Amino acid sequence: MSFFNFRKIFKLGSEKKKKQYEHVKRDLNPEEFWEIIGELGDGAFGKVYKAQNKETNVLAAAKVIDTKSEEELEDYMVEIDILASCDHPNIVKLLDAFYYENNLWILIEFCAGGAVDAVMLELERPLTESQIQVVCKQTLEALNYLHDNKIIHRDLKAGNILFTLDGDIKLADFGVSAKNTRTIQRRDSFIGTPYWMAPEVVMCETSKDRPYDYKADVWSLGITLIEMAEIEPPHHELNPMRVLLKIAKSEPPTLAQPSRWSSNFKDFLKKCLEKNVDARWTTSQLLQHPFVTVDSNKPVRELIAEAKAEVTEEVEDGKEEDDDDETESALPIPANKRASSDLSIASSEEDKLSQNACILESVSERTEHNTSGDKFSNKVLSEKPTPEGPEKTVDVDGPANDVNLETVAEPNDQAVGFHENGREKKRPQLESQPDTEDQQTVDVNLVGEGNDSNIVILETNTDCLKPEEDRNEENQEIIENKLTQSEEIKDIHIQTMDLVSQETGEKEADFQAIDNEVGFTKEETQEKLGKDDKTHKVVISDITSEVGTDEPPGDTQKSAEQSQDAEGGAGEEAPEPAQTLTEKATEGPEAHGAEEEPRSGERVEDKQLEQQSAVCEGEGQVTSTSESTRATTEEPETDEVDQVSESNSIEELERLGVTGAEEQALGSKGEAATELDLEREENAQELPVKAEPQAPAASQASEPPPVLIPSINIHSENTENKGEMGALPKPETILPPEPENGKGNDTDSGTGSTVENSSSDLNLSISSFLSKTKDSGSVSLQETRRQKKTLKKTRKFIVDGVEVSVTTSKIVTDSDSKTEELRFLRRQELRELRLLQKEEQKAQQQLNGKLQQQREQIFRRFEQEMLSKKRQYDQEIENLEKQQKQTIERLEQEHTNRLRDEAKRIKGEQEKELSKFQNMLRNRKKEEQEFVQKQQQELDGALKKIIQQQKAELANIERECLNNKQQLLRAREAAIWELEERHLQEKHQLLKQQLKDQYFIQRHQLLKRHEKETEQMQRYNQRLIEELKNRQTQERARLPKIQRSEAKTRMAMFKKSLRINSTATPDQDREKIKQFAAQEEKRQKNERMAQHQKHESQMRDLQLQCEANVRELHQLQNEKCHLLVEHETQKLKELDEEHSQELKEWREKLRPRKKTLEEEFARKLQEQEVFFKMTGESECLNPSAQSRGCLQTSHPSSTRAPAWAG
């Protein structure tokens, strides 16, 4: 029987192998049938080419996998079988498969639209809800088909969902899928991509006790929906290995901006992302959800049309801006100005995808102060160029912005309000410099709005110098004109776009990146109405267009508020063109010179007032707009306006008390707008931010009614970088604007901001604005602008017969390549993990096969041993019965012969006696008859005696035989019981050893994963250290140059101040100059020492952080190993308990078996005794039939004997 089973198993194995190679063509060159026409990508297991059939011209994606041996084909047969067996419009089809020269060619259906994640990266924005609905429904239908066919995909993500040009999707990549044989079958393989992995799959890394089923794909679908809504999956900032812990322990992820999405979408996600597997909906249930009740795929067709549109690229260098900057820097700098540095800054953060954001900068401006004796403090907004953060957008909050969107124009004509001793001083309006009339228009693809195509068009116009009255009169006209132009653009050019027109009277539209936070408010200022000031005019025009129902809830509100804001700006009275710049004082110590009174007869010139508004867009896109203004304070009788050049470095960051962090220098790679936060992110340091988010600044006019004024608050989130590979900053949060009320004069709202009234020495008032980040050696603004280029992309495509043109503008910097490098490294990590999982799966399959073979072998051996033992005893019993039968037959033969001989002898004697008696008594018939009867009786008695003797002998022999046979049966049963007990022990030992082998390979695989994780962590730490070293090297190289430039400027200004104010002799002046030079040398030496100490501190902190990250990683790894060992110990204990229970139950069943056997033996003995007793009572009455009767009575005993063995 066992041999038959073995043959059956072997036969089934052969059929299965034949079925696996059923769809693979062997020894045929695929290039004879398919022509390679391009390369699509490089996957984890081989390259993917675009191929075309030479006969039918059908396109295919050809995955070419190099296999070292034919055994490796087994790893890919499941994928081929699934592709070949699936016939569904939303699943890619297998077109062909070849195995040729150790290369496996898998040719699948080609989807020209590309993968969903690739489309999002191409368009640099996520999908809208209407697009997500279409993709979700078709993906659900594909999953439902797979699950009905007992297939678990196990690697569902946006990268495996492909678009066709018809607007449909197809599910692809079944490389790690599982094809079950039973509907309720569960799996315990730890496989898939970590970010999309379900919690029950994650738990299989250390415990196989709770296997998963088809609902694991439902969780992955929910994560994929979040990925499509936010470009990246949840926890994408974490290392692929470390995200597993987050998935297992944290709550189910949600949308970053829930109010931005419909309730149906949120409910659908809730049903998908349910950690309790039993409560999680199935695909068939989800198909009934109202979120997927869509029929048209038009949104996806529009998306694909835009993604596949013809792209026109235009690269612009920033050299014109550089020329302007150089011209400005050449202007003379007054030496008797004093600068203060009360600043409120919050750093913006780099966008994860380094998405496009355009940077707007304005020129330096001058201002006149006409009130003598006023105490005020200029708030200097330090700026850093932002080559990254490329798209010009306006006030977009986060990846899914749900706050009320209001456009903020950079006000160049502003009055700056400050608190001093509990009262507010009005800052004079800032004057603009005249320049040529110029206009630059940038059409920008606004990311993250959730609309189909959100476009922000920023128009930066430079007006000629006009009188105050003319400029004020033009305000409303320009607003109305821009409204009209934007409406035309909305109706004709782009259907679903947000149009924001921003017009400023700047000198030139210089692009400049900034990481500061400014709260802008409009305030009525009556001081300057009568003056002939050349104020900067600001016009804000917001138009939001809504198209169809694709716009998610919240956009309508944004649009309404934008329009209201635009109308409010247009409705202001003509004499009120200026906006008031109201900034909150920051926590901590104020800058030197804040709130310091100007000395008599001395003009105080503030530092270059650099205003910036960092605006978060899309997936954390950073859009920075900046305006550099120069304010000059003069005495009342002074009408002189001093023009001061832009400074080349940023000094005030340390003095602002805004962040406790040290400033970052801009490296040659062109770091993004938020250098401070980027350094903290890259160094994995958690540094406190002292600047609390500003409340919207409020101001009110004295006469006109209050209007809604936009206010932007941008504060960086210092995410604690715990060493995750490629951890990227989160988008900043922008607080929604609040309506202005009667509290406009109270600019200090008490939110933790304080104003320091004490004055501090400004080093002889020698324009400290010239060195803003001197200890960090910041590169000059002009140098930074020379490093950047603006890349304009124009997409033209046709949707439903309407030609649509979308223009995006992107700042191309070295940081783009850095971001791409980070993305490439992340892909490498995922690929390494995929290969590792494949190896683990293969090793697990090999171990499972080996263990199954061991179990089959031991069970086969048990069966053979049992059969051998039974056969041995059966043979002994058979021999005993055969011997007994032979003995009985011999005895019966002897008995028959004896009866015959005895009867013959007695009859002979009786015949003689009868003959003799007849001769004697011829006439005595009666006596003769009696004599004959007597003889017959004697014969019968003799024969009966012989028969009785033979019966007794037979009975003894049969009883002895039965006893011997029962003894053999007892021995046989005892041997079987002993064998069963030994088999139970051996089976337990085998299962125990197999369990240890299972956990051994799990530990081995876990250690390999830990080694890979540690290796990735070390590479990440090494990259951080190298980046810090490079940055510090650049800072050290730049510092001497900056110091030389500063020394020359300071010396010139000092000499000029001596010429103006000094009454000393030339010798005294020379001595003062020597003292000043010595002081400068000492100051520069201190700067070098401070920079060196700062660099050492940065490196030390980074190394400590790296060590902490490694320690934390090792702690997590040790916890996993400990958890695995605990599971192993628990399983071994459970196995021992199961064995003890099984042995106990077997012994309990053994007693009744013994009792039944003994009862059977007693019954056989009793039957035998009864049989011989009955046969012994029978008598042979006819002498002639005696021998036959004896034979008949002896035969049953011999024939029944074998039955007792039964």
From Swiss-Prot:
Species for this entry: Rattus norvegicus
Signal sequence, renumbered to the chain: none
A Gene Ontology biological process term: cellular response to type II interferon
Organism classification: Eukaryota, Metazoa, Chordata, Craniata, Vertebrata
Domain Protein kinase: 34-292
Pfam families assigned to the protein according to its UniProt record, in alphabetical order: Pkinase, PKK
Primary role: Mediates apoptosis and actin stress fiber dissolution.
Residues the record lists as Phosphoserine modifications: 14, 189, 340-341, 344, 347-348, 354, 372, 545, 563, 645, 649, 668, 776, 778, 817
Key words, A-Z: Apoptosis, ATP-binding, Coiled coil, Cytoplasm, Kinase, Nucleotide-binding, Phosphoprotein, Serine/threonine-protein kinase, Transferase
Gene (name only): Slk
Positions of the UVR domain: 874-909
Site (Cleavage): D438, Q439
EC numbers on record: 2.7.11.1
Designated name of the protein: STE20-like serine/threonine-protein kinase
Compositionally biased intervals (Polar residues): 556-565, 747-757, 1181-1200
Modified residues (Phosphothreonine): T183, T813, T1065
